[in-house]
């Protein structure tokens, strides 16, 4: 299954590299500024993740809400993250990230986790950017910790 997930992710990322920017979208009154497609590795398990970005002001601070859905190794994940752009270095945006996730493990068990970490994104032109996030997480059901690396590409509208 891991080889299939990796192959699907590679195919999706290759396709995504050829897609151009689209028009802005609004869903349920919320403006979405980009879509993202990535691969997540959590303790040896891989998943293909599709997400979007909705910029909001939270207590006067501009943050990006990043809902995402992932599938891999028989698991279905629903994540809601937030990122805050800290600084820019050599054209790369450095961000602080945090979020929560609901994981439907092997389609018979639910797990809830919380994550915190950092991210970097670099615009490669024509509304596309490559990104990476690295987070530490705590699984409330298993009462253990893990790390997660997500690599991908995003497309601005």
Question: In which residue ranges do the predicted regions lie?
Answer:
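Outer-membrane beta-barrel proteins
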Residues: 2-157
